Amino acid sequence: MQEQYTPSEIEAKVQQHWQDTKTFEVTEDANKEKFYCLSMFPYPSGRLHMGHVRNYTIGDVVSRYQRLQGKNVLQPIGWDSFGLPAENAAIKNSTAPAPWTYENIDYMKNQLKMLGFGYDWSREIATCTPEYYRWEQWFFTKLYEKGLVYKKTSSVNWCPNDETVLANEQVIDGCCWRCDTTVEQKEIPQWFIKITEYAEELLNDLDQLDEWPEQVKTMQRNWIGRSEGIEMTFQVADSDQSFDIYTTRPDTVMGVTYVAIAAGHPLAEQAAINNPALAEFIEECKNADTTEAAMAAMEKKGVATGLNAIHPITGKEVPIWVGNFVLMNYGTGAVMSVPAHDQRDYEFAKKYSLNIEAVVKPADGEVDISEEAYTEKGVLFNSAEFDGLDFQAAFDAIDAKLTAEGKGKRQVNFRLRDWGVSRQRYWGAPIPMVTLADGTVIPTPEDQLPVILPEDVVMDGIQSPIKSDKEWAKTTVNGQEAFRETDTFDTFMESSWYYARYCSPHADQMLDPAKANYWLPVDQYIGGIEHACMHLLYFRFFHKLLRDSGLVNSDEPAKRLLTQGMVLADAYYYNNEKGARVWVAPSDVTVLETDDKGRTVKAVDSEGNELVYTGMSKMSKSKNNGIDPQEMVDKYGADTVRLFMMFAAPPELTLEWQESSVEGAHRFIKRLWKTAHDHIATGPTAELDVKSLNAAQKELRRELHKTIAKVGDDIERRQMFNTAIASVMELMNRLQKAPSETEQDKALMQEALNAVVRLLYPIIPHTCFVLWNDLGNQGAIEDVLWPEVDESALVEDSKLIIVQVNGKLRAKITVAADASKEEVETAGMAEEGVVKHTEGKTVRKVIYVPGKLLNIVAN
């Protein structure tokens, strides 16, 4: 074996072997237990970042470990390759999105191979290819036929100057990113999939996901937002019109003092006809940012409509206001306002001098609403026949009254809205719907699929090429002239079923059910927690759609989910002459002074600018603190980068990038290499004879097999890869100090190194691949099994016993593992320190904790 550890040479050689032998290509095998490990596939942005490397290293470690368990392991990879960044890059670089995307895929594919990830490249998919999205289009038409797809108007960001729709990220401070025109909200027709029909199942089936993080399940429960309440009807005074309101707090209904409706509510638009102030306010509301964050932060404002509503129980009239905090696309677009028992309503009522009437108080006291609303549940008062009732009794009584009078009904509602899948972008899968000359909208016939997105286009930065290309939109269906839909799918569509396509990526159908049902569900899914409420919900929803279409036979797409933490790095900046922050790459920073905890106090860049250190933050382009994986691999090798990624922190926590720790990982691999080299240099080894081992050898072998057991448990059950590595490092320290004088010393070292190489193989596979053969083993390490724990090695011949007198340590003794209490007591009492502290005293009691402690009570 070569003496020096040369990662670039070793890794190139091993990767070539994997490629030549197609090591990681797999097929279905009914005789082997399958294991499907999947990391969320990347967007081909151009270069891998350290977040990618962490995600994919975790997945590769799990996959390689499971392979050594003898399982048939599938680990595929592909590209989530549609999306807005490609359009922006195409505009910037005067090219089309397609070539930019395919070039990035080629580059990033080489980076993934360079890191040694064991993917089945024969299953590679790119979502921007017709071979992939044709089946998405086909499935959409089937959902339409089942009544799960519909079209309705929905609000979008609209630039009136360019006459184009903007994505949320293209709206900067309320203006168009391109021309700085104030952005408006515009209602346009869009396609929706009825995810709400699956809301109850999506909620209930979270209970099946025992191996998903509780945080993700809680976020999904809140996003789905199931609530039980009453939908009640309010009549408009002096009119035959009425409107519905849903509330989860019917116990407060007797305290309604006004009603708030959305700017888009029919009553608001009707009232605005002769009310210029209201009309102006409605326009202002229509152009407001309606994201949750913006709604929470904005000032709550309103304008009275001049209309009154009739309370469904008291018959009293209450004013109807238009409020900017009520959304037409949420609930019924109207809310009952009880300022005494809702803080938002309270502040609004105070602002506009509206009545505040308390109707709920604590069960054991009075209610004080002089400073704020009382929002807890309690006992009703000032509520006529409902006085004295608690929340549930009031809920039931008010429900019964409203139901009997035909003014309301108990109802389950969900916060979840139907999934709007239309995007007014170019670089996405065309939605397979056509409009006939008579205005009828139908799905594109199956024999005309896929509807291919033209790739040879020019991006003008204003309008989608397929919207401006009138010829592309023209088609013929059943001999009739028709026009294609020019919207494209939300890219969450592609990422909602890719995991299933991997099972049969070349099938001339959406899925081959036999193959899909062999591999699915995914056994281990890995990705960031930021995907909890969007991708991971659509992912689950799509699986149920596939199930109900007879394509899969399981309820959920993934058994186990690991959400890895972010990768952080130091961030530095200086203010330029205009006062703007200029972020400086860590590689361009010289630290001049640190505090006693090693934190930067003073630093400069290569041009001498004094820098402000902002601490560790997520690696990002905006803070220029990303570390290029390519540079690290070139400098230290892929195995070092992988080892650092798995050792620096538990997988679900943030990882702080420290190059000194990367150097430490590199030193450890070199130490492993040297230990193996030195052992091999001593020549052939004899067979290990466990019965002839001396006490020191037995102890070393015990540590070896304890480590094998712990590492397996840490990787498989606990997923604490960092502690698994730490255990192997501790064992290596013991091995380096172990004697190599006798044949059994060498035989024991051979057993230990054979085990260590397999324990570390999932993490540093290139190094371990070579060492496995250098140690004299036949065949590739991928084809061997994880080391077995020899239970007999764990049995201890002796035990260390702590001896105390009156609770204080006085001696430590070593006794036979099977020594009786009497034997331990005799040995303990004979110890010099015990004799000294019991002399002249009476032993009152002897307490023995078997195998651990002897406590002598004497006075």
UniProtKB/Swiss-Prot annotation:
It holds the Pfam family tRNA-synt_1_2. CDD domains: Anticodon_Ia_Leu_BEm, LeuRS_core. One of its GO terms (molecular function) is aminoacyl-tRNA deacylase activity. SUPFAM superfamilies: Anticodon-binding domain of a subclass of class I aminoacyl-tRNA synthetases (SSF47323), Nucleotidylyl transferase (SSF52374), ValRS/IleRS/LeuRS editing domain (SSF50677). GO terms for cellular component: cytosol. ATP binds at residue 621. It is found in: Cytoplasm. A motif ('KMSKS' region) lies at residues 618-622. Its EC number is 6.1.1.4. It catalyses: tRNA(Leu) + L-leucine + ATP = L-leucyl-tRNA(Leu) + AMP + diphosphate. GO terms for biological process: leucyl-tRNA aminoacylation. It comes from the Bacteria. A motif ('HIGH' region) lies at residues 42-52. Keywords: Aminoacyl-tRNA synthetase, ATP-binding, Cytoplasm, Ligase, Nucleotide-binding, Protein biosynthesis. Its main location: cytoplasm. HAMAP family: Leu_tRNA_synth_B. NCBIfam families: leuS_bact (TIGR00396). Belongs to the class-I aminoacyl-tRNA synthetase family. This is Leucine--tRNA ligase. It comes from Shewanella halifaxensis (strain HAW-EB4).
